[in-house]
Amino acid sequence: MAASSSGEKEKERMGGVSGMAGLGSTRERLLSALEDLEVLSRELIEMLAISRNQKLLQLEEENQVLELLIHRDGDFQELMKLALNQGKVHHEMQALEKEVEKRDSDIQQLQKQLKEAEQILATAVYQAKEKLKSIEKARKGAISSEEIIKYAHRISASNAVCAPLTWVPGDPRRPYPTDLEMRSGLLGQMNNPSTSGVNGHLPGDALAAGRLPDVLAPQYPWQSNDMSVNMLPPNHSSDFLLEPPGHNKENEDDVEVMSTDSSSSSSDSD
């Protein structure tokens, strides 16, 4: 009788525990099923031990405990399948979380690139607007191409394309001699027999003084006085600084006659 009463109490307890186990999570339900299996197994073993010692037949109670044990084992197997499925789902969730993190990193990288592109586009738009303003301003104060070409020709006619190292903007000197200045320079006078000396030689009085005539003197401030000696023709040496050969009274008279003729011709032309 004691065994039957304890079996009934155990059935009631198992029923209450089974009802409560259905309300928890899968982990709690598995733990509850394991506890039930442990209790039922212990109860069945105790009943078998008592029946063997007392040699009493308690088949009905043993069958009930065994049925409960089999039922709880079936529940446990179902819970195990559910736990395995949930484990697979959990692994899939972890894989999806990693994929989400990767996509999130890609989105952040794209966002950074989009911000850089936005900044570049904003700069380009600003520059385009400024250029449009400049174009509009140029259209309002437009100058014909013919006037620009004329102005360029006027600049090129009076100035060279490059300048000496000492030349700076605003310098009153011209960068390089013009065509007119070249013709009135040393080379131009040497090629012009009417203004040069006899047989293309320099006047004797100028050479005797060790200087060039005023007509052939350097026309530019950056040319030194030493250039007057270096620019002498090749057939003249430094002996001219002392006294050129053939320098006599007759030569001086010839020079005076030539200068008188040139002055008279210039006065007649006036």
Curated annotation (Swiss-Prot):
Keyword Nucleus tagged: yes
MF (Gene Ontology): nuclear thyroid hormone receptor binding; transcription coactivator activity
Coiled coil ranges: 26-131
Modified residues (N-acetylalanine): 2
InterPro entries: Mediator_Med4
Superkingdom classification of source: Eukaryota
Residue positions where Phosphoserine is found in the record: 32
Keywords attached to this entry: Acetylation, Activator, Coiled coil, Nucleus, Phosphoprotein, Transcription, Transcription regulation
Cellular-component GO terms for this entry: core mediator complex; mediator complex; nucleoplasm; nucleus
GO biological process: positive regulation of transcription elongation by RNA polymerase II; positive regulation of transcription initiation by RNA polymerase II; RNA polymerase II preinitiation complex assembly
Comp. bias intervals (Low complexity): 259-270
Location(s), subcellular: Nucleus
Region described as Disordered: 1-21, 227-270
Quaternary structure (record): Component of the Mediator complex, which is composed of MED1, MED4, MED6, MED7, MED8, MED9, MED10, MED11, MED12, MED13, MED13L, MED14, MED15, MED16, MED17, MED18, MED19, MED20, MED21, MED22, MED23, MED24, MED25, MED26, MED27, MED29, MED30, MED31, CCNC, CDK8 and CDC2L6/CDK11. The MED12, MED13, CCNC and CDK8 subunits form a distinct module termed the CDK8 module. Mediator containing the CDK8 module is less active than Mediator lacking this module in supporting transcriptional activation.
Protein family per UniProt: Belongs to the Mediator complex subunit 4 family.
Physiological role: Component of the Mediator complex, a coactivator involved in the regulated transcription of nearly all RNA polymerase II-dependent genes. Mediator functions as a bridge to convey information from gene-specific regulatory proteins to the basal RNA polymerase II transcription machinery. Mediator is recruited to promoters by direct interactions with regulatory proteins and serves as a scaffold for the assembly of a functional preinitiation complex with RNA polymerase II and the general transcription factors.
Protein name: Mediator of RNA polymerase II transcription subunit 4
Lineage: Eukaryota, Metazoa, Chordata, Craniata, Vertebrata
Gene coding for it: Med4
